[in-house]
Amino acid sequence: MFDIGVNLTSSQFAKDRDDIVTRAFAAGVNGLLITGTNLRESQQAQKLARHYPHCWSTAGVHPHDSSQWQAATEEAIIELAAQPEVVAIGECGLDFNRNFSTPEEQERAFVAQLRIAAELNMPVFMHCRDAHERFITLLEPWLEKLPGAVLHCFTGTREEMQACVARGIYIGITGWVCDERRGLELRELLPLIPAEKLLIETDAPYLLPRDLTPKPTSRRNEPAYLPHILQRIAQWRGEDAACLAATTDTNVKTLFGISF
């Protein structure tokens, strides 16, 4: 099983990053996609992906950091994307929930990254929160020019999920679905996601599954907990966990064009 969303550059992993990766593979995880959320972290993610086996990375600017987007950023992302470890542009998209960057700054950076991905023939790794309508409006003209797209950490509605799937977008599911309160609506959507469009992720160190036992004293999520998320998703979809793992691995290879 492959974790498509690990924030391995996080300071929460600074002291034991080697152990985090070792535990993940010991738990049965067979690959990690390390998320880049701004230029500096994208550069760090690429170096980590080169350092660890069976790891890849993304290069891009998260909507929270969109105010940093400028011509030099674009040039650096394009240069970084040429590295073999970098297999997607992102994390890019819109987040109108907190607006750490203005909506205008977010839209400018999102469209710029869609253009880069199209020009480089690379998939996009996307984020959307409280911005679905505008997100789809900006994304749609680019979809036919992109080799693929995933909306990571999906927490939206049934209608939003169906709108994404209808456009060929992959859906990334995290341990959010394990939350006995916030995850209930998402849990009900799991059987409706086509198997060929489903991907799994931890978004570590964030979104520790709330039903994990025993809970780590640090309250920190890590990719070694991906098997727990996989088991829960399989349970709520009514399918075999091993089969689901194989299916999502195939989806990863198809979307990102990698072998593991």
UniProtKB/Swiss-Prot annotation:
Cellular component terms per the entry's GO annotation: cytoplasm
Domain of life the protein comes from: Bacteria
Cofactor section: Mg(2+)
Localisation: Cytoplasm
Presence of keyword Cell division: no
Signal peptide range: none
EC number: 3.1.11.-, 3.1.13.-
UniProt keyword terms in alphabetical order: Cytoplasm, Exonuclease, Hydrolase, Magnesium, Metal-binding, Nuclease
Residues annotated as binding a divalent metal cation: 91, 127, 152
EC primary class: hydrolase
A GO molecular-function annotation: magnesium ion binding
Keyword Nuclease: yes
Assembly description: Monomer.
Similarity field: Belongs to the metallo-dependent hydrolases superfamily. TatD-type hydrolase family. TatD subfamily.
Function, in words: 3'-5' exonuclease that prefers single-stranded DNA and RNA. May play a role in the H(2)O(2)-induced DNA damage repair.
Name of protein: 3'-5' ssDNA/RNA exonuclease TatD
Organism (species): Escherichia fergusonii (strain ATCC 35469 / DSM 13698 / CCUG 18766 / IAM 14443 / JCM 21226 / LMG 7866 / NBRC 102419 / NCTC 12128 / CDC 0568-73)
